[in-house]
Structure formats: C-alpha cells, structure tokens
Amino acid sequence: MNPPGKRETLKSIAIVGAGCSGLAAAHTLRDAGHSVTIFERSDEVGGRAATRRRQGFTYDHGAQYIKGASVVSSALITERFPAADLVDIAKPVWVFNQQGHIQEGDPLQNREPKWTYRSGLNALARCMALGLEIRGRTRIGHLRRTSAGWSLFDSLGHPAGEFERVLIAVPAGHALELIESGLLPEAERESICVQLRRASYRPLISVMLGYQPTPRVRPYYALVNTDKTHALSWLAWEHEKSPERVPRQMGLLIAQMAPHYSREWWWAPSEEVIRDVAKHVATLLDEPLSSPCFTDLCHWRDALPAETTDGEQLNAIALPLGLAFCGDAYVGGRVHLALEHGVAVARQIAGTW
C-alpha cells in the first residue's frame, strides 16, 4: 500500500530477463499493484533452470535442482506455485576428488530437500510465467533515461516501450553492455559499471549421455567434485529424479564439466567432446558402460558466478535513477538464491514510490 497522502496509481515497470529472479520480482511487483512487462531475448523462460525433451528423454541441462532450505523460495515452490509433479530427489549427493575416490557427502546438506519436477526443472518457470506479460525473442539493446523514467529499445534500435522503472535481471556482462551503451547520468553510469565489472562467470559444458541398459544402480543420485581439480565437476543420474524422464530400460547421465576443461574444449567439435567426456565418466565410475545410445551437449558461457559483486551497493546507486539489478551475479549461482533476490529487490523498488 502507498503511504498516507500518496495517490494510488498503477506504476509501469520493465524487467529485462525472464530468468527465475526476474519472474519472482515480477510477481512481487504485481502483488504490490504495479504493471509489469518482461523482455526476454529467447523464446523460453527460466534462464539456466532449463529443460530439454528429445527422443523420449527429459533432462535438466543447466541447473540441476532447487535447494529447499530457504523459507522464501520454498514458499514460492510449494505454496504460491504448487505443482502436482513436484518431487524431492530421494537419494543423496556424494563427493569425489581428483583421484576419483568416491565417498559420502555432507549429511546436513543431504537432509535438505532437493526440489525438481517430473516434467523437468523448467516447470517452475513455466508456471511462474502464466499470467505475466512476457515479450519473448526481444533482446533489449539500449536504455535511455527520460524525465518520466526510461525508454527501452531492442537490439535493432526499435522502441520497446516507456516505463517508470527498469529492473535488469540478466547476467552481469549483458547488464554491463546495457549500461555502457545507455543514456544516463555519466557519474552514476560509471559507478554502476564499476560494480558490474567486478562480477565474472565460469563457463560450463553440459553433456548428456543416454545408455541402454540402464547404468548400475548407485546409493547416490549425483556426484560432485569437491577439490575442483577433476575434469568432471558434476555427474548426475537423471533418471533417479523420475523414471518417466527416460525411455524404458534406459538411463541418462548428465556430466557437467569443470571450468578449466570447459575452456579447453569450448571450440572442439561436439562429437569429440562427447567421446572424451564419456571416457572420463566410465573411468570415474569404473563401470563398463556401453556406447551411448543418445547424446546431447550444451555450452553455458555464464554458467555460475566465479566472483559476485555487491548488489546492495549497486542498487543504492541505481534505485534513485529508477533502475535496479537482481540475479545470480549478486548472490551466487543457485536457483533459490536468485528467487530470493528477485523478491527482495522488487520490494525495494516498490518502496521507492
């Protein structure tokens, strides 16, 4: 509600980016009675909470699950946007080191819920997108500060709309491009750019390997490399999330490669990458896996923040201009943190009126 004496009017807000943070912010702002328009450069929502469906396989090739330890994100998942196919991955995550030694993981972390959906992790973002005004396949390339707020332009220079506030919910590199090319006060622009340049990301190659017959049953759902020296950063048994995700008598492993490996193999042909990754997987598991019957590959340039920047300092500079930022560049690369940050920053924006 507006403070006493303030006239209640519908305020217009543009959100650049339909990832989980931007979607959470959109609902928070709509709940406060504001008009929200989201601009998304792709035809999908959810960012790295992404799901593919190919040849009978359903798999999450970006973020793997949502940690359930947070009150805010858990309320969004279980109460605000409930779904019949929501599941808590039953098996734990174990760990391995450079030598390939596998052992049990942190028992405290493994007690926390690991939320996903039978139909894919992207189910949350698709549910959150319902009822929102989202302009897909629209890359915002330019911002201009006006006396009434902000003018937005797409990457071709065409007008995209006039708004009183703008929330930028994209990776820091894209946000930096928008500010560097934007027309806004010079001192504030440089201060914002200084903050955004402090954020950096790790690249990640995600490789999907389908097998028939199903790989050997393990006491864990996934393995994570804790000393960060192995070529494999993460290896998950995707069919453990839900048997409906794979064709009958098949299994699907998801290998997410370490930053150093991903950089080295970034431009290599897909077939060579898949072949090499399959060898690393078979060696780690010490299991005579057959040749994969299904493969897929995805390059994530901005997979996880290597360095975050101070979102509070950034928004302290930006909010007086009617501008704000949210997302993983400020809180780290976890879906639940992105959801929380979107809600928190949206509340800050609503409080500026």
Sequence positions of predicted segments:
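Active-site substrate-recognition segment that forms the wall
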Residues: 208-264, 282-285
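A conserved short coil-to-beta-strand element within the FAD-binding core of flavoproteins
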Residues: 136-151
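Short beta-strand to alpha-helix junction loop
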Residues: 65-72, 102, 106-127, 267-273
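N-terminal FAD cofactor-binding segment of flavoenzymes
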Residues: 51-94
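Conserved flavin/dinucleotide-binding core of flavoenzymes
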Residues: 24, 44, 61, 248-353
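N-terminal Rossmann-like FAD-binding beta1-loop-alpha1 element of flavoenzymes
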Residues: 11-38, 346, 350
